[in-house]
């Protein structure tokens, strides 16, 4: 058995595929284009869970996180200028990780404002956002909702504190319940 820790797998990409991809992106859609989805990866966490096999970073400061966000936005802006994607509105947005809710309210606002400037998602069917309950405050959940997020994945994993502890989770059951209850209050 093996796990996929990067998607698509590195073995998927072959040098001979690059010209075809560039050609597609540099051409306007011929027919009804395939619905557009955007995944933005946030590889930061408060701590590494014992079962996690993904590349995550637990020791990054605000300036390093800003540099990562800036690089991701630069890539989005580049793709947003390509004829195949220019002017399109995504059908779905997914913020995965790591832990997207690790970002501060200011970082989340900057990230999403800059993304929406390139790919507005006011008509998206779903905007999904992964969380770790211990990183959520009412202020942050309110902001996440106002940013247009329609679905939360709370990352509860378990309600037994002993199991959470032995799995290396940073949160405990009371944070699961608090986050869930407030998310329901504000319409998730």
Regions found by a protein language model. Name each.
Residues 1-36, 46, 86:
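Flexible, acidic/Gly-rich N-terminal and inter-domain linker regions that tether
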Residues 8-10, 43, 100, 133:
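Proline-rich low-complexity regions
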Residues 34, 52, 123-125:
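Residue-level signal for beta-strand positions within conserved beta-sheet cores that form or flank
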Residues 36-37, 92:
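Structural motif
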Residues 40-56:
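Local cysteine-cluster metal-coordination motifs and their immediate loop/turn environment
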Residues 56-84, 90-188:
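Conserved non-cysteine loop/helix-boundary elements of the Radical SAM core domain that shape
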């Amino acid at each position: 058995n093996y796990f996929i820790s990067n998607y698509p797998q590195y073995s998927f990409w072959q040098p001979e595929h690059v010209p075809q991809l560039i050609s597609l992106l540099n051409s306007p859609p011929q027919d009804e284009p395939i619905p557009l989805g955007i995944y933005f990866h946030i590889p930061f966490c408060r701590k590494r869970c014992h079962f996690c096999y993904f590349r995550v970073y637990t020791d990054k400061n605000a300036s390093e996180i800003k540099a990562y966000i800036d690089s991701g936005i630069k890539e989005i802006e580049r793709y947003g200028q390509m004829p195949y994607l220019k002017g399109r509105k995504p059908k779905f947005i997914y913020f995965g990780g790591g832990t997207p809710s690790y970002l501060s309210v200011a970082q989340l606002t900057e990230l999403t404002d800059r993304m929406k400037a390139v790919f507005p998602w006011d008509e998206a069917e779903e905007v999904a956002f992964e969380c770790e309950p211990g990183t959520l405050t009412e202020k942050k959940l309110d902001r996440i909702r106002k940013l247009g997020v329609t679905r939360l994945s709370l990352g509860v994993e378990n309600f037994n504190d002993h199991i959470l502890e032995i799995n290396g989770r940073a949160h405990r059951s009371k944070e699961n319940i608090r986050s869930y209850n407030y998310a329901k209050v504000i319409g998730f």
